[in-house]
A protein has these predicted regions:
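N-terminal signal peptide c-region/cleavage motif recognized by signal peptidases
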Residues: 14-17
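Residue-level detector of the transmembrane beta-barrel scaffold of outer-membrane proteins
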Residues: 61-74, 120-124, 172-176, 207-211, ...
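Long, repeat-rich segments with strong aromatic
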Residues: 234-288, 310
Length: 312
């Protein structure tokens, strides 16, 4: 455990040093030498964000996808007063439809072979942020941050090759306690707790996971608003496929109601970019619950950026 946190600190220090080095690259007068400088440091950063590096050197693994999407456009804003949302006293403050979206997500193993062979206990953390980077009138605030710590027990079936779901063998089963909140106070505070179950099936380049959950009672969302599951759903279905150097994935949530059906759809495509250490990343999302502040507000969003570390 100590080694894992030490590794995380070392990783952050290392990435910061690379950032300073890349800034120095911009001072090189020769275009060819300047490009070579950028390439060398981007390759090093990619290595340090690579899944094997996380696992073998730092004891940390990517959990969900890690990405930065500088161009993220959504079609409509929610009903919150921008002055309240940004804690601003200015009368002409508004929410921009164009913003930056980013997500960091990692998993830190704590114990292995604790109860059964090939089982593990780990801590995971995911943070998704929506930054009004281009909103000068509001001083470029973060519109929303969603914090999601998770404690996971997982049983891996590393030798199982028997097809169960669409000829895909069961590779793991997990039970986790998940807390999700936006870290705000007073009327903008939103958060909920769930007991989650996750079955993951995989073969070759295809991965499918089914994650239903039980919502804990008396959380901030259910206390303040009724029928939360109408918007956030009861499960999440993830599908990922790797083709050559391209990654395709989808995430679906739904309330499974014929009357008043609501849900969420997310489609992702990661593609290689020549001479750049990261993959390009396109994301389209539609529906409810992309963030807690928007969980009752239907949003359509198209984003473009880079993938730092993927689910595979």
């Amino acid at each position: 455990m100590k080694a894992g946190w030490t590794g995380a600190i070392c990783m952050l220090v290392s990435l910061n040093s690379h950032g300073e080095a890349i800034e120095n690259c911009s001072e090189i007068e020769s275009a060819s030498q300047r490009l070579a400088c950028y390439d060398s440091h981007s390759d090093k950063i990619k290595t340090e964000l690579d899944s094997d590096y996380f696992s073998e050197k730092l004891g940390i693994q990517p959990y969900h996808s890690n990405y930065v999407l500088p161009v993220s456009y959504h079609n409509s804003n929610n009903y919150y007063d921008p002055k309240l949302l940004f804690n601003s006293k200015e009368d002409d403050v508004d929410i921009d439809n164009l913003e930056l979206k980013l997500q960091i997500s990692f998993r830190l193993p704590i114990f292995s072979d604790l109860v059964l062979p090939h089982d593990s206990v780990s801590f995971a953390y995911t943070q998704t942020s929506f930054w009004q980077l281009y909103n000068r009138d509001a001083s470029k605030p973060f519109r929303e941050n969603t914090y999601e710590p998770e404690l996971i027990w997982q049983q891996d079936y590393i030798h199982n090759e028997e097809g169960i779901l669409f000829n895909l063998p069961l590779k793991s089963f997990a039970i986790s306690f998940n807390h999700q909140s936006n870290g705000r106070s007073s009327n903008l505070s939103l958060g909920w707790n769930r007991l989650m179950f996750n079955w993951t099936f995989a073969r070759d380049n295809l991965t499918v996971s089914f994650k239903p959950w039980i919502r804990m009672p008396d959380d901030d969302i259910s206390t303040r608003y009724k029928q939360t599951d109408d918007y956030m759903g009861h499960f999440e279905l993830f599908t990922g496929y790797k083709m050559n150097r391209h990654l395709f994935s989808s995430t679906i949530r739904n309330n499974l109601k014929t009357d008043g059906n609501k849900g969420y759809l997310e489609l992702n495509w990661a593609f290689p970019i020549k001479k750049i250490g990261f993959k390009g990343f396109v994301q389209y999302s539609y529906g409810y619950g992309e963030s807690l502040i928007d969980y009752r507000h239907k949003v359509s969003r198209l984003s473009l950026g880079v993938l730092l570390a993927s689910w595979q």
